[in-house]
Amino acid sequence: MKAATFLSAFALSLGTQAAEPLDIGSRWELFVDEFLVASQKGLGLKLHEPVRREVVLTTDKPWEGPTCGYFSVIQDGRKVRLYYRGSAGGSDHSDAQVTCFVESEDGIHFTRPKLGLIEAGGSKDNNVVWRGVESHNFAPFLDSNPSVRPEERYKALGGVKLPGKNWHQGETPGGLYAFVSPDGVHWKKMKTEPVITKGAFDSQNLAFWDSTRSRYASYSRIFSNKVRAIQS
């Protein structure tokens, strides 16, 4: 009886031993659940809500319209750059959508540079850097790849699932297109075909250089059994 009791207690102690700590190295980890938490006492996970502050930009120009969205913020040296969609509504596949650009030195006071690149709102006297269906969700990033070429310091993804109209290329296949720019203002496609074709692409599709894995990564929306999901 004593031997059986000892063996049972020993087995129980093995079953309740704490698991070995997970080695995450230098990776950043997002605490969205308790997977990385061994124990907690007197605390809990809480999703913090954003607090509305002062308005720093009003999208009231003729080429911007009432359905601006998908804002991307990039800090390049002393400049804070903000990219967003200009649209008066309508189809996601319209070539009337534009990508706008403003910049600031403090992240509060933004100015619209008069670029003179693309006609929108009846004039080229605007801050538009791209026009076409890809502007529906054009999302740029500053490439931190140590081997990046100077003429490709900025990169972006943009596009929708179904074929759409492009301002100067006619109808283009559906999917996400890759863009490059030396300065964040003058953009061109890396290739004429989309680089990702499987997905919904109806939201902001994010890409970046993953220094941990030494490769580019992208996150976009997809529907799995009619349920919204994220793919990478």
Where on the chain are the PLM-derived regions?
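Beta-rich carbohydrate-recognition and catalytic domains
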Residues: 19-205, 209-232
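Hydrophobic h-region of N-terminal signal peptides that target proteins for export
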Residues: 8-18
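Sec-dependent signal peptide recognition
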Residues: 1-9
